[in-house]
Amino acid sequence: MIRIIALSKNQIISIAQFGTLLAIAIFAPLLHNQLITGSIVNAVLFLAVLTLGWPSAVAIGALPSLIAAVSGTLPAPLIPMIPFIITSNAILIAAFYLFKNKNYWVGAVAGSVLKFLFLYSASAGLFNFIWPQKIAASIAVMMNWPQLITALLGATLAYLCLKMIKSLD
């Protein structure tokens, strides 16, 4: 006997949203511009928290880095950064999730600042032990202020997307 299991409309919508947000997060790095890529990926993380919940957002925050490493699109010197990138995305997601009900911007700024502080601390202290000085310096710059800027731009982009979606309803 064959048993057919049907998905509800809400389950189908959630799967479609997850797939769409994941696809955007995976393809954004192909733009090869940290400001654009980081802003898009962070916007996806904020949107995922709001539309799918924090567990799905954490998965979306982890998968692009892992896929980039496996597919060869991530430069080899950045592969040791993957755990730090995934952790910083989880920090952004957790802080935003915890504070978003108080106020969207309180959650967005808290998540952005904590993500930046984590990556800044990691780059300032640890990277000199992993890479030669020249490579460590360039990676430290990438993990510095651009992380805060792209997280805040991502929050703004997500907010504008939400406003646009609500105006279409």
Q: What residue ranges belong to the model's regions?
A:
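Loop-helix junctions at membrane interfaces
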Residues: 1-169
